[in-house]
């Protein structure tokens, strides 16, 4: 065998190991720590649970801030394989200092990892594509800071149809599917 063969075989093995792996279907225990953006019955979390057969504990609540989410998640004694964290909208729209939000997200990540979970932070959509409000711009600024959080951070979904986000914040089924596909391709494959 020649050297080129071994190089090609090695590259193929590396490709297979890192790019063809997929989260195994089955009864993985998954937690979602979020707000109203993670509560839709046709939401990204249920789309992914359907694809992978997960059992989900959803700690999301309408109007929930990162501080409230941290307290709710901290009160749980359950352990999870994966914890999805999708927070920040209510902090931003409520005028909470972004440094506090980032600190709360770090605490949620640390708590999840202490319980043995993989963490996946979801910044969500590019809000300035669907709203020109000052809060939308501040929310995008917060999302840009999330990339420095420990663990996996999904990229911001930038291809959003304004018609599917009528209030500039909450999105419909098409955007939930886009977000589920982005999360799937970025963090689960």
Residue ranges and their predicted role:
Residues 1-21:
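Single-pass alpha-helical membrane anchors
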Residues 37, 75, 127-189:
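Catalytic His-Asp segment of secreted/periplasmic serine-dependent ester chemistry enzymes
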Residues 123-125:
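Short strand-turn motif at the edge of the Rossmann-like AdoMet-binding core
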Residues 1, 22-29, 78-79, 177-181, ...:
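Acidic, glycine/proline-rich intrinsically disordered low-complexity segments
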Residues 26-33, 37-107, 127-137, 170:
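Conserved SGNH/GDSL esterase-like catalytic core that processes O-acyl groups on lipids
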Residues 114-119:
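A short helix->loop->beta-strand "cap" motif at the edges of active sites that frequently abuts
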Residues 50, 113, 147:
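Anion (oxyanion) recognition and catalysis
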Residues 108-112:
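Hydrophobic positions in alpha-helices of CheY-like receiver
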């Amino acid at each position: 065998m020649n050297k080129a063969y071994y190089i090609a075989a090695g590259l193929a093995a590396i490709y297979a190991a890192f790019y063809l792996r997929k989260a195994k279907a089955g009864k993985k225990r998954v937690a979602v720590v979020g707000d109203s953006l993670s509560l839709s019955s046709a939401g990204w979390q249920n789309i992914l649970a359907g694809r992978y057969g997960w059992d989900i504990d959803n700690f999301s609540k309408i109007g929930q801030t990162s501080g409230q989410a941290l307290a709710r998640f901290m009160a749980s004694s359950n352990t999870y394989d994966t914890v999805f964290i999708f927070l920040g909208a209510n902090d931003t729209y409520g005028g909470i200092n972004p440094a506090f939000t980032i600190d709360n997200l770090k605490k949620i990540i640390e708590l999840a990892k202490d319980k043995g979970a993989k963490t996946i932070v979801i910044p969500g959509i590019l809000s300035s594509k669907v709203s020109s409000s000052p809060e939308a711009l501040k929310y995008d600024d917060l999302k840009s800071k999330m990339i420095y959080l420990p663990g996996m951070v999904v990229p911001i979904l930038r291809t959003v149809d304004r018609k599917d986000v009528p209030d500039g914040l909450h999105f419909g089924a098409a955007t939930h599917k886009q977000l589920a596909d982005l999360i799937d391709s970025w963090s689960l494959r």
